């Protein structure tokens, strides 16, 4: 994450590319009362904290002792003072008191302890600022928050203090003698950097092992910054790789060294020269002579120490990075040489040149646990004790150890933590950036990582270079005041981390053998198979042919949103760091999530103009151009264009451990959620070479859990078996039609049908409809079971989800009119079915397969005892997906007539096979009575299903009826009489009118509402015949009467008998009907928080970029979907399990067992060893106060990567409230909406903020005030 300074505004960008916060760099255009946000004041990103921080800087700048200081240095001092004031304040109100801020500040600054610690900082800062315009620059490493003295610019006072206080000059200069010889920018380009050099004079003022330092892991994560597409045209230094100044940001996991910029009189422009006697010309000839001698002596000592290891492991280093290699050497431990190898030097070495003619060496983030331990800091500072313990344990287990840093990144979806090893985040380009301004120096900003609950969200780490448009972070300064207890850290690009987090992260560090880096050069054959295990990609389970097919299709499946750039040459033989070596593309963009208009709730055109309301630098809401034209508050909206470009997020990357090349995670089919710190990642090309050389075997298929390994049910087995039989028959028909044998005709392979969700739900009847039929005792709710069924197909050895449908099953225990009814709610598919050929009947073969799945499901429901099925054939609109997120661009969305024809062909097949006995429309079956119908038609007889069309329409009609005036009611009564006379119906006149209005609404689109009869219905009473005997007309087709209606038929006059339109009457034949079975589900309940609702599943895919617009993305999305499915259910009993108590296999991916199965079967449950995660997190129970505080936070939080679980929950609740048709009405309604309104009312009663941003807060306050006034007037 980086910040860019444009026209006095510092804008911070999260990894998603969305602006998260904007603060004025100068001036106070808003008062604190207008922008108070008290919910996150414990964070540095708080607006209130930012205001007070800048006020502190303003006051400091007014003092004489700080007037000559650089502004950035004052900002860091102000930050530390602000943190101290916040921690020591009795309350937030006292901390926010701006009137007493100057007094409190002066009390701190005038204290003796503060002034004593600031003495040497002030001298160094002033000296640096005075000489910044004259002196060149060199970079010197700082070990553990301690700056090694520079050659000639260290003030004498600081040098003397270092000497008199017992500083070990050898230890203090060891790192400085071996700094990375990369020249900094010229003074005229970056003068501010020279003014920020601060020296810590003695050990007593050293900060603790920085709990405030941000994470910069040394794994394989790479971050693309703005300007990646213009590497050859920019003159700015790079910061995205290990050779950039990002290496100056300290790694809190490894306590690696940082770089600080120091001016000196002269320095050779030759890169890579050692500070030795042979290079005396590099050192200044005036002043600090003893210091120069110390540098030379230290260099000679380290060369002596490292000579033996240089000879033994010369292949790992180059001449250009000899100094960097020296920095890894440590004194003897237990009589042996130790070498710190956090990562291989060749992974990070290499350099890149810019237009100024200088080069930078790639430096490694060295793990300094051993150095820290040896230099005597662990005994003095409590924050380093975990490091000491880790090193002590490692020394006991191995004579030569290294630290393997891990970067736990939270997975909100499963509650797990996985290391961010090998990942890199691609940050999209900054939007609306002037190219001239892009060449200016940019100031570092507070690092904010994109950490969504279900997306690959990794923290920023070292990465290969290729990002020119960035600034050096080498001027960071760290100091502390041990009297006041403040950590005064000048790290603009870091976030605050507590000491507790530091301890926890260090406790996760795994120590391994340092000689493991030599295995890659020596092992071969069988021994190669015994190295680190794989498991991060499903490609390891593929054959060589499948791998080749997968690689061939990648070049054809790149998205149209790609950013074309020229192919860059590799550096020092390494692969191009900005190009995926699998697909050959650079930066690929995901399809942005759709924006909905806040007024009309329609999707805003992604390529057109729209308007946004900005609050605190973030987009609060968006409206379309049409609503903006009709809006009366146009001033508060800003016009924007094409959010398809501004909202798009770039694909993530991963680096191969073997060839060091970078690939898109999607191309590599890499699953970042199951990365094992001990596992290695090998790209497809390297793995294919190993397979061709017979050096390695692919994983066993059982170790990669795919669609076949999902739990089977009777429903899925029934559909699969029926589909397999029908495909065999269809293939034979194609062979006969083409005159070929069956083997010569292509067949369909690799299909898998699975039920991924089967959850019990309850549908609440909308209150107006319920009250309308209060006399008829209409039920208030309908229980049903929601099921999600998916179809997978093996495509080049990888599962791809092709088809999804959600159904609602109202069983025999459900009250009428939904008893024994099935509602086909949603159907969705993507066009990746293979082979793409025609069936024997002339339709597409994929259509044949989808029809057979639906017919198979209806057949299964019929056998279980269901009697009817309703379907609403409503096509989805563009970018408004039903189930699968983002469809291919080549797939056309069907219009209403096409979709209607598709369902009609389905029904014809079902009728032909006897699955459906009669096909009707909802209008003809219930709303349009025939002469044979002997019962009163009522709206209460229509099946009332969740998210169906007509229940919402009926509620709207009843709501409109309640709003009519008394004058209109007289007209309405006359209309009722006319309708009753015309239709000749009996019953409630209002019910008749409601049916009439529904009929008028459905008549023009009645073909879109199908009513399929799976069993015979009585033509007189319209009830299904579920048991006993029935009577069928011998002359008419499908004319059945139940036993009761047939008895009434015999008692009616002959002229009124069937058929009523003719004089000749038909005879009936008695048929004995077997009673229908109860609809009890034979399959177990399978609940999943991601798949129980199609809204939850769709949002889960949107949040995690599980898209299906290309085949490569469909493969990766399916892989992640399968991972979540396997990870959330027990592999033995297939029941939902508690993730905190799950037992997991370390070999088989996604193989998890619940605690009950493990207690029952133990180790015999699985062939491999199972391990239970010990540091599980207990689910948090929220109180009312938590919800109220979370409501305020969620209403102001526009960060898509917010890690607060309660914030995400409440945002989902708001989203549900917008879409819900049931809502909270009367004494019933949707229980989620009821909870939301109760929460809003409770908040409004307690809220005293006139400008509260919580939803409907002001409206509820006005409503309460009106009610209070009304009550007072009545009582008065």
From Swiss-Prot:
UniProt cross-references to InterPro entries, sorted A to Z: CBP_P300_HAT, Histone_AcTrfase_Rtt109/CBP, TAZ_dom_sf, Zinc_finger_PHD-type_CS, Znf_FYVE_PHD, Znf_PHD, Znf_PHD-finger, Znf_RING/FYVE/PHD
Superkingdom classification of source: Eukaryota
Cellular component per GO, a single term: histone acetyltransferase complex
PROSITE patterns: CBP_P300_HAT (PS51727), ZF_PHD_1 (PS01359), ZF_TAZ (PS50134), ZF_ZZ_1 (PS01357), ZF_ZZ_2 (PS50135)
Annotated binding of Zn(2+) 3, by residue: 1130, 1133, 1154, 1157
Annotated residues for binding of Zn(2+) 4: 1145, 1148, 1168, 1177
Record field: catalytic activity: L-lysyl-[protein] + acetyl-CoA = N(6)-acetyl-L-lysyl-[protein] + CoA + H(+)
Coiled-coil annotated spans: 953-973
Biased composition (Polar residues): 396-413
UniProt-recorded name of the protein: Probable histone acetyltransferase HAC-like 3
Organism field: Oryza sativa subsp. japonica (Rice)
């Amino acid at each position: 994450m980086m910040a860019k300074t444009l026209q006095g505004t510092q804008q911070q960008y999260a990894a998603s590319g969305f602006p998260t916060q904007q603060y004025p760099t100068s001036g106070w255009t808003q008062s604190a009362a207008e922008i108070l946000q008290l919910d996150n004041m414990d964070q540095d990103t708080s607006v209130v904290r930012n205001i007070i921080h800048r006020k502190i800087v303003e006051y400091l700048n007014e003092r004489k002792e700080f007037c000559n200081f650089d502004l950035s240095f004052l900002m860091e001092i102000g930050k530390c003072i602000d943190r101290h004031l916040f921690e020591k304040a009795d309350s937030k109100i006292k901390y926010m008191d701006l009137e007493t801020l100057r007094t409190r500040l002066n009390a701190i600054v005038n204290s003796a302890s503060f002034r004593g610690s600031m003495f040497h900082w002030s001298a160094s800062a002033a000296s640096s600022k005075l000489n910044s315009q004259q002196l060149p620059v060199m970079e010197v490493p700082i070990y553990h928050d301690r700056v090694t003295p520079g050659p000639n610019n260290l003030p004498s006072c600081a040098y003397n203090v270092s000497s008199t206080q017992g500083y070990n000059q050898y230890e203090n200069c060891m790192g400085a003698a071996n700094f990375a010889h990369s020249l900094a920018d010229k003074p005229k380009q970056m003068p501010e950097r020279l003014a920020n050099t601060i020296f810590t004079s003695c050990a007593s003022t050293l900060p603790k092992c920085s709990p405030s330092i941000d994470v910069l892991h040394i794994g394989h994560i790479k971050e693309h910054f703005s300007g990646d597409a213009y590497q050859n045209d920019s003159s700015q230094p790079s910061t995205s790789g290990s050779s950039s100044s990002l290496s100056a940001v300290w790694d809190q996991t490894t306590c690696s060294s940082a770089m600080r910029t120091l001016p000196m009189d002269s320095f050779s422009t030759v890169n890579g020269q050692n500070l030795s006697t042979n290079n005396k010309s590099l050192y200044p000839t005036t002043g600090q002579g003893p210091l120069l001698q110390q540098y030379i002596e230290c260099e000679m000592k380290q060369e002596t120490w490292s000579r033996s290891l240089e000879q033994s492991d010369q292949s790992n280093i180059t001449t250009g990075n000899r100094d960097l290699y020296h920095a890894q050497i440590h004194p003897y431990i237990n009589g042996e040489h130790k070498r710190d190898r956090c990562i291989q030097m060749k992974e990070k070495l290499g350099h890149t040149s810019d237009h100024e003619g200088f080069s930078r060496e790639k430096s490694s983030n060295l793990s300094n646990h051993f150095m820290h331990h040896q230099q005597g800091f662990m005994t003095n500072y409590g924050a380093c004790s975990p490091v000491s313990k880790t090193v002590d344990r490692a020394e006991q287990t191995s004579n030569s150890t290294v630290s393997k840093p891990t970067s736990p990144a939270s997975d909100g979806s499963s509650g797990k933590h996985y290391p961010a090893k090998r990942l890199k985040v691609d940050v999209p380009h900054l939007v609306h950036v002037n190219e001239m301004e892009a060449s200016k120096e940019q100031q570092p900003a507070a690092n904010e990582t994109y950490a969504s609950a279900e997306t690959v969200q990794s923290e920023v780490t070292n990465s290969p270079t290729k990002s020119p448009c960035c600034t050096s972070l080498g001027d960071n300064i760290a100091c502390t005041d041990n009297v006041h207890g403040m950590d005064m850290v000048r790290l603009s690009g870091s976030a605050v981390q507590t000491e507790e987090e530091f301890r926890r992260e260090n406790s996760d560090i795994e120590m391994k053998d340092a000689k493991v880096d030599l295995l890659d050069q020596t092992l071969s054959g069988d021994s190669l198979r015994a190295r680190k295990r794989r498991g991060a990609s499903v490609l390891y389970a593929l054959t060589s042919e499948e791998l080749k097919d997968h690689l061939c299709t990648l070049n054809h499946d790149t998205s149209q949103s790609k950013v074309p750039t020229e192919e860059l040459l590799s550096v020092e033989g390494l692969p191009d760091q900005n190009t995926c070596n699998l697909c050959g593309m650079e930066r690929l963009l995901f399809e942005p999530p759709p924006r909905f208009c806040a007024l009309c709730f329609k999707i805003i055109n992604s390529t057109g103009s729209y308007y946004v309301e900005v609050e605190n630098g973030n987009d609060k809401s968006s409206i379309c151009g049409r609503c903006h034209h009709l809006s009366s508050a146009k001033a508060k909206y800003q016009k924007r264009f094409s959010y398809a470009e501004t909202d798009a997020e770039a694909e993530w990357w991963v680096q191969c451990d073997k060839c060091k090349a970078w690939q898109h995670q999607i191309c590599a089919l890499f699953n970042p959620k199951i990365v094992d710190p001990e596992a290695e990642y090998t790209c497809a090309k390297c793995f294919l070479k190993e397979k061709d050389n017979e050096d390695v075997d692919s994983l066993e298929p059982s170790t990669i859990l795919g669609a076949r390994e999902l739990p089977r049910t009777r429903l899925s087995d029934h559909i699969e078996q029926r589909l397999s039989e029908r495909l065999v028959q269809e293939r034979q028909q194609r062979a006969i039609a083409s005159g070929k044998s069956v083997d010569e005709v292509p067949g369909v392979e690799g299909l898998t049908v699975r039920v991924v969700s089967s959850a019990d739900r309850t549908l609440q009847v909308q209150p107006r409809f319920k009250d309308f039929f209060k006399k008829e005792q209409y039920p208030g709710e309908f229980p049903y079971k929601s099921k999600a069924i998916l179809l997978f197909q093996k495509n080049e050895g990888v599962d791809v989800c092709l088809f999804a449908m959600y159904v609602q099953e109202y069983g025999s225990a459900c009250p009428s009119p939904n008893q024994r009814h099935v509602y086909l709610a949603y159907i969705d598919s993507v066009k990746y079915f293979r082979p793409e050929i025609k069936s024997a009947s002339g339709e597409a073969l994929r259509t044949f397969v989808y029809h057979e799945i639906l017919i198979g499901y209806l057949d299964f429901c019929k056998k279980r005892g269901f009697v009817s099925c309703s379907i609403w054939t409503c096509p989805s609109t563009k970018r408004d997906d039903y189930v699968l997120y983002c469809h291919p661009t080549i797939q056309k969305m069907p219009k209403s007539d096409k979709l209607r024809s598709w369902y009609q062909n389905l029904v014809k097949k079902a009728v032909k096979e006897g699955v459906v006995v009669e096909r009707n429309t909802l209008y003809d079956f219930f709303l349009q009575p025939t002469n044979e119908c002997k019962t009163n038609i009522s709206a209460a007889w229509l099946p009332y299903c969740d998210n169906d069309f007509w229940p919402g329409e009926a509620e709207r009609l009843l709501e409109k009826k309640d709003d009519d005036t008394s004058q209109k009611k007289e007209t309405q009564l006359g209309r009722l009489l006319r309708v009753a006379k015309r239709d000749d119906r009996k019953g409630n006149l209002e019910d008749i009118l409601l049916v009439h209005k529904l009929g008028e609404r459905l008549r023009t689109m009645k073909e879109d509402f199908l009513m399929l009869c799976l069993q015979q219905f009585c033509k007189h009473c319209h009830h299904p015949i579920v048991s006993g005997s029935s009577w069928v007309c011998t002359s008419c087709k499908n004319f059945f009467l139940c036993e009761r209606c047939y008895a009434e038929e015999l008692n009616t006059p002959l002229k009124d008998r069937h058929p009523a339109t003719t004089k000749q009457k038909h005879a009936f034949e008695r048929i004995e009907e077997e009673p229908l079975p109860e609809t009890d589900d034979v399959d177990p309940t399978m609940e999943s928080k991601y798949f129980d609702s199609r809204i939850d599943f769709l949002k889960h895919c949107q949040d995690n970029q599980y898209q299906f617009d290309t085949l490569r993305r469909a493969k990766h999305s399916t892989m992640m979907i399968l991972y979540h499915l396997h990870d959330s259910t027990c592999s033995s009993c297939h029941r939902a399990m508690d993730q905190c108590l799950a037992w997991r296999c370390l070999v088989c991916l996604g193989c998890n067992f619940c605690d009950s199965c493990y207690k029952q079967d133990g180790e015999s449950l699985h062939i491999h060893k199972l391990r239970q995660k010990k540091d599980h997190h207990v689910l948090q129970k929220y109180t009312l106060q938590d919800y109220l505080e979370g409501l305020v936070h969620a209403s102001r939080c526009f960060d898509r990567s917010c890690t607060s679980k309660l914030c995400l929950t409440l945002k989902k609740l708001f989203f549900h409230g917008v879409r819900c048709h049931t809502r909270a009405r009367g004494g019933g309604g949707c229980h989620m909406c009821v909870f939301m309104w109760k929460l809003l009312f409770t908040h409004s009663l307690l809220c005293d903020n006139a400008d509260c941003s919580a939803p409907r807060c002001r409206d509820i306050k006005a409503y309460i005030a009106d009610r209070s006034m009304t009550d007072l007037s009545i009582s008065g």
